[in-house]
A protein has these predicted regions:
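Amphipathic alpha-helical scaffolding segments comprising HEAT/armadillo-like alpha-solenoid repeats
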Residues: 1-12, 32-51, 72-86, 104-121, ...
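Structural detector for internal amphipathic alpha-helices that build alpha-solenoid repeat scaffolds
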Residues: 20-33, 53-75, 80-83, 92-106, ...
Length: 222
């Protein structure tokens, strides 16, 4: 184990003993990914599994599951995360959280692969899944709002975003609709402006979403 990895693990252990550990501390492992983290992290996770359940009303954070997802990425890369996304059922919340922290190019590959799970149509049962998909992709899109991501990513992601928006409209879910619309700041270009103008939001909080994203696209491609 390198000195840097050992130092980081000891810091995590100290925070855990003080009951000050946060998910953000675990995610910092992804800034300098190394397979050397896997064994000590899994040892910590095993200890958490044996901890007593928190009292009623106390927020339970599934640290062991977060470590599980981080270790899958360290061991198998994004392909491992894609395979594990629905095992167990709610694991996707954590997988998307990990995807938000890894290099953008890797995350995009995973998001395109994951989109295949609803390529033939989004079902009512997938609403929460798609909501988290759009939210996480939206978070990543903020990093790229001033960059030209290229024709390939535009052609790959815009149909997915339109599919999600169409589903959100049918469910009257403006949260999903807004997050998917904001993603156009990264993947959209001038050819999408008329489409964005056609989108209408009823909630005041979201009403200017389309206009804001159009301005960002126009500025980017001026």
């Amino acid at each position: 184990m390198t000195e840097a990895v050992e130092k980081h693990i000891k810091k995590l252990q100290r925070l855990d003993k003080k009951d000050e550990l946060e998910v953000e501390h675990l995610l910092k492992v992804l800034k300098t990914p190394s397979k050397e983290y896997i064994v000590p992290l899994r040892e910590m996770a095993e200890q958490w599994k044996n901890d007593p359940q928190p009292q009623e009303g106390v927020l339970f954070v599934p640290y062991a599951e977060w470590v599980g997802a981080i270790c899958i990425y360290l061991e198998e890369g994004t392909q491992g995360l894609v395979k594990a996304i629905d095992k167990p059922k709610e694991f996707f919340h954590i997988v998307f959280g990990v995807l938000e922290e890894i290099p953008v190019s890797e995350a995009f590959t995973a998001f395109l692969e994951i989109a295949k799970t609803f390529s033939t149509g989004i079902t009512d049962e997938q609403e929460d899944f798609v909501k988290k998909y759009a939210y996480s992709l939206c978070c990543i899109s903020h990093q790229l709002k001033g960059e030209n991501v290229g024709k390939d990513l535009h052609e790959a992601f815009v149909p997915i975003l339109k599919q999600i928006i169409s589903f959100a409209q049918s469910k009257k879910n403006e949260t999903i609709m807004c997050n998917a619309t904001v993603c156009f700041q990264a993947f959209g270009d001038k050819s999408d402006i008329e489409y964005l103008k056609s989108l209408t939001f009823t909630e005041d909080y979201y009403k200017n979403t389309g206009k804001t994203i159009i301005k960002r696209i126009e500025k980017k491609y001026a």
